Every structure is written in C-alpha cells, then in structure tokens.
Design a protein with these regions (language model features):
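Cytoplasmic membrane-interface "Motif A"-like loop-to-helix N-cap segments
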Residues: 56-67, 288-302
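Residue-level signature of mid-helix packing/kink "hotspots" within the transmembrane helices
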Residues: 12, 40-48, 150-151, 272-280, ...
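Hydrophobic core of transmembrane alpha-helices in multi-pass small-molecule transporters
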Residues: 73, 87-117, 321-337
Length: 417
C-alpha cells in the first residue's frame, strides 16, 4: 500500500500545479489536456507491457526502478521554467511559454512510462500472497493506496502557493518511500521460505511458467482471446473516464466555482476519502454476500454513479457547495468500488500465473480514457467556458458501463470453487 501510494505522490501533483501555471503563464487547459492525453495513453501502454513483465520478474526491484525515475522527473518538473529559458533565451515571450509546454510534456511522458512500473508488480504480489476467496477484500484494502496517495497530495498541494513546490515536496516524500520498499518488500512466499499458494485448475506449474512457448499459449488463451476479459476492460475504460475526469480537472472545476485553493484541495481529498471507504465496503460486500462475484457489486455501483453525476450537473450552478460536496463524495464512494473490483475479477479469471498480464490489458484500455478526459474535456471547457455538460457526458458514460457489466452478471470466476 505504502509503495504504490508513493507513485501517486509523483503523479497526481501535476493536476494541482495546473491552476498555478495557468495563472502565472497563461498556459491553456487545452495544452495541459494534450499533455495528459498523450501521457495517459503512454501510461496505458506501459501498464500493459509491465503487466506482462511483472509475471516474470522480481516485483520489489520492478517497483524501485519505476519509482526512482518518477521521483527524478518530478524534481525536474520544478525546473521547467529554467530549462525553457536555457533553450529559448527568454523568460516571458511566446517561445518561452511554448518551451515550457514542451519541457513539461517530455517530462510527463517519461514519468508516465515509469508510472507503469507501479500497479502491475503490486498486482503480482497480491495474487502471489492472497488466496482467491479473500482477493476482493484484500485487493480493496490495497487499492486504498490510490486514495491515500491522492488524498495526501491533495491536502499538501492545496496549501502550496508555488507551482514548483507542487512537484518538489511530493518528490521528497516519495524518495523516502524508495528505501522503505527496498527494506520491507519481498517478492513471493517462496523467497522467504514459506509455501506457495495452492495451484488452481488450469494454472501453469513452475516449469511451464519458465517455458516461453507454454507461457505464451496460456497467456493468449486466458487473456487475449478471453471475451470476458475484454468486457471487463471496456467497462474499466468507462470507470476511468469518470474517475480521471474528476481527479485531473477537479481542482480547475472547483476553482471555476469560486472555491479557494485550500478548499479545493480539501474537496478533492474528500472525494478520495470517500473512495477509500467505497473500496473497502465493495470488497467486503463482494466476498461476504456475493461469493466473490465482484462484477455484481460493480454493476450496482456504476448505475448509482450515473445518477450522482447527473445530480452534480444541476448543482454546480445552484450555489449549494455543501450539497455539491456531499454528492461528489458519494460519487467517489461508488466509483472506486468498480475501479478496484474489475481488476480482481480479471485476476481471478487469469489465475496468478497471468493475473498481471490480464490487469495490464485492462490498464491499457482504461487509460484510453485520457483521450476524452484529457484533451476532450479540456478543449470543451475552453470552448464553452465551464464544466456543465461534462457531468452529463460522464453520467451517460457510466450508464453505458452499467449495461456492459450486466452482461457478465452470472459470471463465476475461473479459479473460485
């Protein structure tokens, strides 16, 4: 949990620097949207590639390498103005601004490549240490690292008035996290002298796992030609459109409503706190009442998310900030359940030998969402001068996701008795 939350420290800080950069240099939302769109696509591909790698590499060092590079890029982000000035020879004109956008774009791309080293190794660790019948609950607990990281960053950056410090302060905290991972994390039960989890039907043994041909055949069958995995992947795409739209543009949306920077930070933090509670409840309900059929919990929550988003559309201009905050928190509570449990369902279907690959494929699809949440929503906000109909769009997307996940309502995960 702590290790993956560190990745969020040097990832979600970018969103809180955007209003400050916009205010100081006049960089448009569309420019930042393009950066986030391309970066999100790169992250999706990286998550997919690292998912395959994580099934065959040491998870601890995989995490350490990725986090180290992300910390370095976050530090360099704070010097973007000086780097641009070095190449353009100016500190204020159009060339300088364009140079800053290019510098931040390049650094963001590098950051996103190595952000992909975070989720897949953690998923590999979970399926290596946790039996399938406990996976929804335990994975939901681990998934709170998303919200913990984003919550702490939101609070810290909410009180920072210089955009450079939005990058440097979280980077220093994540730097300490690197040493925590090295000292405390181990790859598999076998690496510390404990017995491995029992194998399940259809799973590769250790020798087959090392055989490239056998592993490739298993991967194609369990992941790439599995229609259920693709249903889960497309549903996760819709989940991430909603989640990322609020995380990426939340500070800008709330600033546009007239909220102070401090209150904006706390409002986004409340979304994350509610998400934490939602993940824990969803995992417990899935294992306790639905016999680990997580997709059923996802369907109910997605439908309720759609209702919340339509409500946010009507509240944003109603001068009712408390009601807006309550509904935003409820949306966070609900959307983080599917965000955690769709991966659990995919991992159980693919078995622990290909779980990271399955989750990597879902990750690739989910980060296609940045085409809409990044450039698409940013350009719409610039054109229409507000975020009103974006909430309606997100509500419609959540409704489509509900219909899609209902198609696998009766699914029984492949390795659950």
């Amino acid at each position: 949990m702590i290790g993956y939350s560190m990745f969020y420290f040097v990832r979600k800080n970018f969103s809180f620097a955007i209003p400050l950069l916009n205010q100081e240099y006049g960089i448009s939302n569309a420019s930042f949207g393009i950066i986030m769109t391309i970066g999100g696509l790169i992250y999706g591909v990286s998550k997919f590639v690292n998912g395959i790698l994580a099934d065959r590499t040491n998870a601890r060092w995989h995490l350490v390498i990725g986090l180290s590079v992300c910390v370095l890029t976050s530090i360099l982000f704070g010097f973007a103005d000086r780097i641009s000035m070095f190449f353009t020879g100016s500190g204020q004109d159009g060339d300088f601004i364009r140079g800053m956008v290019i510098v931040m774009g390049v650094l963001y791309m590098i950051n996103q490549i190595f952000q992909g080293c975070g989720f897949a190794p953690c998923n590999h660790l979970m399926v290596s240490w946790v039996p399938p019948r406990e996976m929804a609950t335990k994975m939901s607990i681990w998934n709170t690292s998303h919200s913990v990281g984003a919550f702490v960053v939101a609070v810290i950056c909410g009180y920072i008035t210089r955009w450079q410090l939005c990058f440097w302060v979280p980077a220093m905290i994540a730097f300490v996290g690197i040493f925590f991972i090295i000292l405390s994390l181990r790859d598999t039960p076998k690496s510390v002298g404990l017995p491995e989890l029992p194998k399940v039907k259809g799973e590769l043994d250790d020798n087959q796992q090392k055989d490239p041909k056998a592993f490739r055949h298993f991967l194609i069958k369990k992941v790439f030609l599995n229609p259920v995995i693709w249903v889960l992947a497309v549903t996760d795409l819709f989940v991430y459109i909603v989640r990322f739209a609020i995380l990426a543009w939340g500070p800008s949306m709330l600033s546009g409503m007239g909220l102070s920077k401090e209150l904006t930070g706390w409002t986004v933090a409340v979304f994350e706190i509610a998400g934490c509670a939602g993940m824990l409840c969803a995992g417990y309900i899935s294992d306790k009442f639905f016999k680990s059929r997580s997709q059923r919990v996802c369907a109910v929550e997605m439908a309720l998310v759609a209702v919340c988003l339509v409500g946010l559309h009507f509240l944003q201009d109603a001068d009712m900030p408390i009601m807006f905050l309550i509904l935003l928190a409820l949306a966070g509570f609900l959307i983080y359940g599917p965000q955690a449990l769709l991966g659990v369902t995919a991992a159980n279907i693919a078995t622990k030998r290909a779980a990271s690959s399955a989750v990597g494929l879902i990750g690739l699809m989910s980060y296609l969402s940045t085409i809409i949440t990044g450039f698409g929503f940013g350009a719409l906000a610039d054109k229409f001068g507000g975020w009103g109909w974006i909430f309606i769009t997100m509500g419609a997307i959540a409704a489509v996701g509900t219909v899609l996940i209902l198609s696998v309502w009766n699914l029984k995960e492949g390795n659950i008795d």
